[in-house]
Amino acid sequence: HLLSRRQRQMCIRDRVYAVAETKQIKTNSGVELVADDIIAHLVGHENEFDAVVFSCGDAVPVFAQNADKPYNIDLMSVLKAFGEKGKILIGHCAAGMLFDFAGVTEGKKLAVHPLAKPAITKGQATDDKSVVDGNLFTAQDEKFVWTMMPEVLKVLK
């Protein structure tokens, strides 16, 4: 399969990393997925990627119960490394809260789920549907992700 120069410029390569011990994961809704790899294998390879997209879903209660697990420690390490390098962090729902926990939101505005607002201590939680502030792209929840997509696509080109 050959791509024209324009097509190559428009391609966005992606890899899905499971925040788990194995690549085989199941969503809280019961959907089974096989990721490309596990989050532990992304640690130390942050320079190979331009952005992280964190999809929240109902992950936060599970995260809270398992915050001390190696895969969640790796997740926080990856988010911190991407943020400190000024790389793009994209997420919705409570993703902004995790970015805040990772220590990469100082002085930045975030769109977060209303229930996550009180947990934001370094950044500034807003009531906006979505917010782009520097390298942080956040949406209040999944139904508002579309409101930031033009900016996401612009920066990823």
Where are the language model's segments positioned?
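Glycine-rich phosphate/pyrophosphate-binding loop and the adjoining helix
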Residues: 121-157
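Short internal beta-strands
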Residues: 13-20, 92, 109-113
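A conserved active-site-flanking secondary-structure segment within enzyme catalytic domains
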Residues: 105-126
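N-terminal beta-loop-helix "entrance" segment that forms/cooperates
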Residues: 17-38
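Catalytic nucleophile loop
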Residues: 52-56, 75-103, 110
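Glycine/threonine-rich flexible loop motifs
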Residues: 60-73
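Short amphipathic alpha-helix with an adjacent loop that forms part of the alpha/beta core around
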Residues: 39-48
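Single conserved hydrophobic/aromatic residue that forms the stacking wall/gate
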Residues: 1-12
